[in-house]
């Protein structure tokens, strides 16, 4: 698995966390740099930790499934990517309108209870739950890493940094631009993961080598 593939996988995995970070930016008024930093640290940290856990589990079973490990990686990445796309597209126009209204209502309430809302949104408990929820996919992808012969330390550092940067920017973007980009981010992330899965399958079955030989 090349560095480029790892970077693209990092972007794909980070899109759920990015979308949630945008939502955080929407619900917070007058976002400060330390607010964005806190969100980014939680999401980036868990996004790096989960693949490591998955990799450890995958290594335990690697010898038993080595003959078809590339199919496992392909299926996991394609399933996760497809799930992200499906979840982003399943909301109809009526639901989106309701979300837009609820966001506007929450902003009005937020002006009255800004301090209380900020503490709730940025609490360690709240961020931990969200960080775990958005990094479950990374746990599954981490299992596939065990079969690819990659440097797990280098990989989780790359994934963690990408998630950190995107989530930091996501909070700021959320405050400025609202929830326009949330679903698009998840769709892009899903497509990236599916393409990475296809690439792994083609590489390990020798199809790419035959095409370019």
Curated annotation (Swiss-Prot):
Source organism, top-level taxon: Bacteria
Assigned keywords, A-Z: Cell membrane, Ion transport, Manganese, Membrane, Transmembrane, Transmembrane helix, Transport
Similarity remark: Belongs to the MntP (TC 9.B.29) family.
GO MF annotation, one: manganese ion transmembrane transporter activity
Lineage: Bacteria, Bacillati, Bacillota, Clostridia, Eubacteriales
Record's protein name: Putative manganese efflux pump MntP
Cellular localisation: Cell membrane
UniProt keyword annotation of Acyltransferase present: no
KW Zinc (keyword) present: no
Pfam name, any one: Mntp
Signal peptide segment: none
Bilayer topology annotation: Multi-pass membrane protein
Matching InterPro entries: Mntp/YtaF, Put_MntP
């Amino acid at each position: 698995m090349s560095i480029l593939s790892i970077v693209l996988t990092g972007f794909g995995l980070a899109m759920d966390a990015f979308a949630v970070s945008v939502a955080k930016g929407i619900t917070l008024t007058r976002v400060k740099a330390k607010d964005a930093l806190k969100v980014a640290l939680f999401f980036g940290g868990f996004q790096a930790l989960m693949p490591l856990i998955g990799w450890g589990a995958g290594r335990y079973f690697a010898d038993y499934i080595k003959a078809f490990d590339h199919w496992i990686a392909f299926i996991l990445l394609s399933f996760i990517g497809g799930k992200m796309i499906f979840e982003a597209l399943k909301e109809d126009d009526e639901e989106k309108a309701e979300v837009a209204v609820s966001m506007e209502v929450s902003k009005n309430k937020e002006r009255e209870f800004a301090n209380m809302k900020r503490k709730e949104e940025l609490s360690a408990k709240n961020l931990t739950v969200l960080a775990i929820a958005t990094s479950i996919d990374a746990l599954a992808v981490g299992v596939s890493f065990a079969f690819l012969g990659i440097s797990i330390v280098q990989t989780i550092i790359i994934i963690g940094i990408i998630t950190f940067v995107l989530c930091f920017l996501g909070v700021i973007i959320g405050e400025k631009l609202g929830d326009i980009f949330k679903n698009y981010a998840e769709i892009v992330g899903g497509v990236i993961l599916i393409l990475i899965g296809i690439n792994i399958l083609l590489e390990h079955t020798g199809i790419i080598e035959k095409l370019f030989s």
